[in-house]
């Protein structure tokens, strides 16, 4: 559903509320989940260590890819808002859960998360500011940062513009 050109689009822009919806249901194959968001449909598999297929993205991989995608997209958006000509952006994220040493007893959260941002067309200071602002704006990153026992974020700037 596109809000552009409708009153709903203006409401989203004016009241500051951002809403997201997605769904999932089991399939005929154990551990294979049929997912949807808006009109997009995709498969997520449970991991092999749970006896699931593990062929498609796992829930953890899909979540981490979403965190990384939010970082890339918002670095570009914030750069545009600030009049910075941001070049190619890449984000790598790695996370670990240690079931033998849980962070919390009531919920499973990541013990350690490492993120690496590479941002082209900017200097080191601009890159760090973009990542800092992204962190305040992305609810996925915020969820990870607020819950992980350890969070390491590395930022690398490339003042030359690449082809992305």
Give the positions of each predicted feature.
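Extended beta-strand/beta-hairpin segments
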Residues: 1-65, 76-164
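Alpha-helical metal-binding/catalytic segments enriched in His/Glu/Asp
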Residues: 70-71
């Amino acid at each position: 559903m596109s809000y552009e050109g409708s009153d709903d689009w203006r409401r989203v822009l004016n009241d500051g509320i951002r809403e997201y919806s997605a769904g999932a249901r089991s399939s005929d194959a154990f551990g294979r989940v049929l997912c949807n968001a808006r009109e997009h449909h995709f498969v997520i598999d449970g991991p092999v260590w749970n006896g699931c297929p593990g062929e498609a993205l796992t829930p953890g991989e899909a979540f981490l890819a979403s965190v990384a995608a939010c970082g890339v997209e918002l670095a570009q958006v914030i750069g545009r808002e600030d009049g910075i000509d941001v070049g190619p952006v890449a984000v790598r994220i790695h996370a670990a859960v240690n079931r033998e040493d849980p962070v919390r007893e009531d919920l499973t959260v990541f013990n350690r998360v490492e993120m690496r941002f590479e941002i082209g067309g900017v200097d080191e200071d601009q890159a760090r500011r973009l990542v800092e602002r992204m962190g305040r704006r992305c609810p996925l990153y915020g969820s990870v940062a607020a819950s992980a026992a350890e969070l390491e974020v590395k930022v690398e700037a490339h003042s030359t513009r690449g082809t992305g």
